[in-house]
Amino acid sequence: MAGNSIGQLFRVTTFGESHGIALGCIVDGVPPNMALSEADIQPDLDRRKPGTSRYTTARREADEIQILSGVFEGKTTGTSIGLIIKNADQRSKDYGDIMDKFRPGHADYTYQQKYGIRDYRGGGRSSARETAMRVAAGAIAKKYLRERFGIEIRGYLSQIGEVKIDPQTVADVTKINWQQVADNPFFCPDKSAVEKFDELIRKLKKEGNSIGAKLTVVAENVPVGLGEPVFDRLDAELAHALMGINAVKAVEIGDGFDVVAQKGTEHRDEMTPAGFLSNHAGGILGGISNGQPIIATIALKPTSSITIPGRTVDINNKPVELITKGRHDPCVGIRAVPIAEAMVAIILLDHLLRFKAQCK
């Protein structure tokens, strides 16, 4: 299983399983002499961790980060930073019934077929629990980008099921009310949509069902020049990183799929001496950042861990009916906002370091 690392100069490698002893990661390429402590990382983990609201899984994990290496007297040394989070609230007994059954819509079947063995407890390595370490590494990247280059990376939830926010609240990404986003459990910039999200999630929890979501990440103050054509284009690398998040089924940069209905006269981002007149491209042209806000949107599927019976097969390919036990999110998109922010931060810092190494 070789796909556990991302990045070239800023490189993140994660390890651990949902019901294992701990989760961890190694972060390579962090420049030296940056002030860093657990307090710089913990806030983003608190935004992602389970059990923080009635809209997410009831599993309770403190997700307390511990720095093992790479920091001396409060500053990064330029060596590998080791991070670890101890698991505490596993209930592996909830998964005894699926030891020999494949949960439909999950990675159980494909992991078993590929490796001939799998950790069935909460999905093991395929669980979104692993993303806690991506958020931890991303927090380091966000801090460096913010302090050294003024780059801000923030995300918001725009849709749950059929309920959408008012598009006017995000029409100009430079004027999004980020305090409103921070002040509600849905990371929602539209105050009027919060109540509708609340009603929908409550209804789904009563039904034992789940729903999908859409969220957007905005990176502001990104300099011109990030991205390595042709195969390491910035948009391609962002799409790769974001598609690697559990449950993500689609990625859009800028206007994304809406470009199909646009004409060239509408889509082209015309320029004047004062700058661009629009940002349909989402801040990237020819695979290189153009200095405008980078806008990336992802769609997440509804989790298949629901209490409504469903048909599947066991390891002997015999038909069985399955009810998923355990504690699960009715909408995984809610807690995915800090995860998506982290992945964008990891890619941007990696490309910024690559840009500095080659161009300036």
UniProtKB/Swiss-Prot annotation:
* Statement: the UniProt record of this protein carries the keyword Hydrolase: no
PROSITE patterns recorded: CHORISMATE_SYNTHASE_1, CHORISMATE_SYNTHASE_2, CHORISMATE_SYNTHASE_3
Its pathway? Answer: Metabolic intermediate biosynthesis; chorismate biosynthesis; chorismate from D-erythrose 4-phosphate and phosphoenolpyruvate: step 7/7
Which cofactor(s) are needed, names only? FMNH2
One of its GO biological process terms is: chorismate biosynthetic process
Record text on cofactor binding: Reduced FMN (FMNH(2)).
For this protein, the Enzyme Commission number is 4.2.3.5
> What function does this protein fulfil?
This reaction introduces a second double bond into the aromatic ring system.
Q: Which family does it belong to?
A: Belongs to the chorismate synthase family.
UniProt subunit comment: Homotetramer.
Could you identify this protein by its name? Answer: Chorismate synthase
Q: Which organism is it from?
A: Actinobacillus succinogenes (strain ATCC 55618 / DSM 22257 / CCUG 43843 / 130Z)
Lineage, broadest ranks: Bacteria, Pseudomonadati, Pseudomonadota, Gammaproteobacteria, Pasteurellales
